[in-house]
């Protein structure tokens, strides 16, 4: 599954939820009628009578609130209690349904996660754990064995080369970036 969002808190009393968007194509992924898979085992209820998150959710409606928060209504989610039960659920699409980028300088998150990170001098630093999408620039989360994770801005000046075939990302970090 390719994660395209994480369901956040309910908005109002009619089942609408906030969604933390994790895709560059929210208008396509969250279009009315879109069927999204849910993370297996998401939000296992504490008692038998609790709402169980289904394996798929169908988007009924989606809209931007104040230009920055995506509000989504899913079919069958009719009140705040059910919306609250969805909180924290990851939603996504099958990787097979995602076309590869047409621009050679563009990558999907799942293509980068797990790649080795090396300096331009060839020193292995660790691997990419995930990509965080920040307002100014995307951030590569560098996981280093036995050390804290480091956020590396995904910009040409710091990440000059992505070698998917070779399974590596070459970085040229400015002084002190890896010490934070």
Swiss-Prot record:
Binds ribosomal protein uS19. Belongs to the RimM family. Keywords: Chaperone, Cytoplasm, Ribosome biogenesis, rRNA processing. It comes from the Bacteria. Its main location: cytoplasm. GO terms for molecular function: ribosome binding. This is Ribosome maturation factor RimM. The PRC barrel domain binds ribosomal protein uS19. InterPro entries: PRC_barrel-like_sf, PRC_RimM, RimM, RimM_N, RimM_N_sf, Transl_B-barrel_sf. An accessory protein needed during the final step in the assembly of 30S ribosomal subunit, possibly for assembly of the head region. Essential for efficient processing of 16S rRNA. May be needed both before and after RbfA during the maturation of 16S rRNA. It has affinity for free ribosomal 30S subunits but not for 70S ribosomes. GO terms for cellular component: cytoplasm; ribosome. The keyword Chaperone applies. It comes from Salinispora tropica (strain ATCC BAA-916 / DSM 44818 / JCM 13857 / NBRC 105044 / CNB-440). HAMAP family: Ribosome_mat_RimM.
């Amino acid at each position: 599954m390719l994660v395209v969002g994480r369901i956040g808190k309910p908005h109002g009393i009619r089942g609408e939820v906030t969604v933390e968007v994790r895709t560059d194509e929210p208008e396509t992924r969250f279009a009315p009628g879109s069927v999204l898979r849910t993370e297996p085992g998401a939000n296992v209820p504490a008692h038998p009578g609790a709402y169980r998150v289904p394996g798929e959710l169908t988007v009924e409606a989606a809209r931007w609130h104040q230009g920055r928060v995506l509000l989504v209504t899913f079919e069958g989610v009719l009140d705040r209690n059910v919306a609250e039960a969805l909180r924290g659920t990851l939603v996504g699409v099958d990787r097979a349904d995602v076309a590869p980028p047409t621009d050679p300088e563009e990558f999907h998150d799942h293509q980068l996660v797990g790649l080795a990170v090396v300096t331009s001098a060839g020193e292995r630093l660790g691997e990419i754990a995930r990509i965080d999408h920040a307002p100014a620039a995307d951030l590569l989360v560098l996981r280093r064995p036995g050390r804290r994770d480091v956020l590396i801005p995904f910009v040409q000046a710091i990440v000059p080369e992505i070698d998917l075939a070779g399974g590596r990302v070459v970085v040229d970090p400015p002084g002190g970036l890896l010490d934070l």
